[in-house]
Every structure is written in C-alpha cells, then in structure tokens.
Amino acid sequence: SFKLSNDLSVLLISDPNADKASAAMNIAVGSNADPETRPGLAHFLEHMLFLGTEKYPDASAYQKFIQANGGHTNAYTAHENTNYFFDVSADNLKPALDRFAQFFISPLLDEKYVDRERHAVHSEYRAKIRDDARRTYSATKQVMNPSHTYSNFTVGSLKTLAGDVRPDLVKFYDQYYSANMMTLVVEGKESLAELKAMVEQMFSAVPNKQTKPISVKAPLFETGTLPARLSIKTLKDTNSITLTFPVDSVRDHWHEKPLHYISDLVGYEGHGSLLAYLKEQGLADGLSS
C-alpha cells in the first residue's frame, strides 16, 4: 500500500493467474454529509457519477465497456462511506481503470439526466416501502437522537430531491470528493510495479481539496431514552425479537475486530448454544447476530 502525491491511499494486489481484474474506490463520506434540506443527496450523486465524464461523455459508455469485457459494475452509499467498484476481464484492466478514474476527476453530472435519475432513486425508495426489514430499520431511527445524522432519511425521493438539485449535487461533489478522502484498491494480473505505474498515471489527477473528515459529536441516543422498546406490526406473518446495543466506536480496533468475537459467540448454533436452548424450549427456530 502507498499514497499518491495527492494523498490518495492505494492498495494493490497482483495475481498473475487471475482471469478477472477489479478495482474499488471508497470515499470516506456518505449520507452523513447530506444537507438537512436534501436528504438522499449522497445516494443521488452515486447514481449521477455513472453518467458520463469529460473524457468519456457518453452516459452509457462506461457500463457498456465493462459489460462488453465480461465484467460488472455497481456502487453503494452507506452512512459514512460511498463505494464504487467493477470487475472486468484481466486483459482490459487498463482501459477500464482509465474510464473509472474519470469519475473522480471530471464527471459531467449532466443536467439532462437529473430528472431520470431522480425518478430512479425514488423507485428504489418505493420498492422498499413494503419491505419489513426496511420498515423496521426506519422505525428504529424514530427513537434515535434527531441531532445524529444516522437518524435521517437517506435514500432520497422525488420530494427531497425536488427542484433545481444540480447545484447542490455539484457543491457536494466539490466539497467531499477529494483525493485525501479516497482509498483505491486494484487487483490485476500485472506486476505490482506495473499496477503502481498504471494507478499513478490515471489517479494522480484526482484533486486534493484537503477535505476534513466528517465528525458527528451528537450521541446516537439521547440521555434518558434507553432502554427503549419498539413493537412493530409486520406486513408478513412473521415473529421476531431484535436486541440492539449501541456501543462506542471500535474503529481504532479494526484489526482485532472485538465485536466479531461477541457476534460469533452469541450466534453460535452448536451444542450448548443459545439457539440450541431456545429450540429445545420451542421458542425459536433461528438466530442471527
């Protein structure tokens, strides 16, 4: 791993026997940066970034190239990060990577596609309205601290993205899509030296705006609001109980992953486990942690 001159972090993986190559770009900003007046803006930007760049202006050029060369591409917006990724036949990593790099150098964010993608985002929102898992997730947010960004609506809709949204989109991109907020991973059949040269050539032009990481100081739950109980009527005929424990950030312990140990212990399904006992008592037929 290394950093480019623009402070963009890079991890390279060389596999001479690979028949596929891949790359992923993670930006350390997500829906936590949505303006109060534009819930879902980070997700909307994720959609718009695929639709042409100055170097490759055709809105479908990137998708067509990846698909024509045996690959697929996608992206997702989470609370604290946004991730773009693709895989492609190993022989086509360089041209794919060049197209990919332009997302973070000179995207068009073309006005003529704003309304189309606004409706696409709204369709994603509507598709999950009757999904019990999403309904439960949304209901849980209602008891969180409204001052914490995690409590906000993040998908986006025709209402939250109404009007002239492009200036807000450009402002968000210009403010947060900075090289110092990005981490790139590239895997290919080329040697590490060749991969490094490729990345330096294509990604050194990503501007470094010295963006400061977002820090949310408000507690996830306000003092005195816990313990709390939510009773949610599901649309499907299912019964479940979910126990949620807010904990302090363990980001500094990413290597040890302490919460994974707790999760594995609680979720163990063998002899003497919590699930085994619940099954014996006729109280549960499954458990996940």
Per-region residue spans from a language model:
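Active/ligand-binding-proximal structured segments within catalytic/core domains
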Residues: 7, 16-66, 243, 253-266
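Charge-rich, well-structured scaffold segments of protease-associated domains
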Residues: 3-8, 14, 61-214, 220-222, ...
